[in-house]
Amino acid sequence: MYKRQLLPLLDQPCPVERMSVVYALGRNPCPTAVEKLVSLLETDDNAYVRRATAWSLANYDNQIVLKPLINALKNDVAAVRLWSSSSLAEIGNVSLRNAQLAAEQLLISLKIDNEPGVRSNCIWSLCRLYEKLNNTFQESFVDECTKIALFDKEPSVMEEAKTALDSMGMQGFYN
């Protein structure tokens, strides 16, 4: 009951209030909130609210959250992209179809995003989805991780790629 009482607070003018409610609804999912949360991710003018929403949507396995999270990973500011990439791992684990759709954008973002934290999270998320992906996609991910582990300019992303390769049973594959 109390979760439904939170929903009107998502329309408050103060972004701190909206963000607090979004986090509360992420920790305590309310199925009736999912459409409003998606709307906030897509339209709220405050990046902190959108970031909180991207995080919270990981706890909603409703199909409608997949596309907005993918769009946020493509188009939003770095903090929102970072949490969108992590949330896509959770939503991707709901079904094979979700896993494939999420992984496609995660791999693209891994290749083109200029923010190391986002790229590292894309690697982490793809590792979480790895077992659900088809062999061709798994091979593409391993190839990309190998390139990153050997040649990336960002040490933190290189280390994440090495950790990913190790977790997939390819210890030392990048040496």
Where are these regions (language model features)?
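Amphipathic alpha-helical scaffolding segments comprising HEAT/armadillo-like alpha-solenoid repeats
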Residues: 3-11, 30-42, 62-74, 93-110, ...
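Structural detector for internal amphipathic alpha-helices that build alpha-solenoid repeat scaffolds
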Residues: 8, 16-30, 39, 48-62, ...
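Short inter-helical turns and helix N-cap capping residues of alpha-solenoid HEAT/ARM repeat scaffolds
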Residues: 13-14, 45-46, 76-77, 114-115, ...
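Short, highly charged low-complexity linear segments
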Residues: 80-83, 144-153
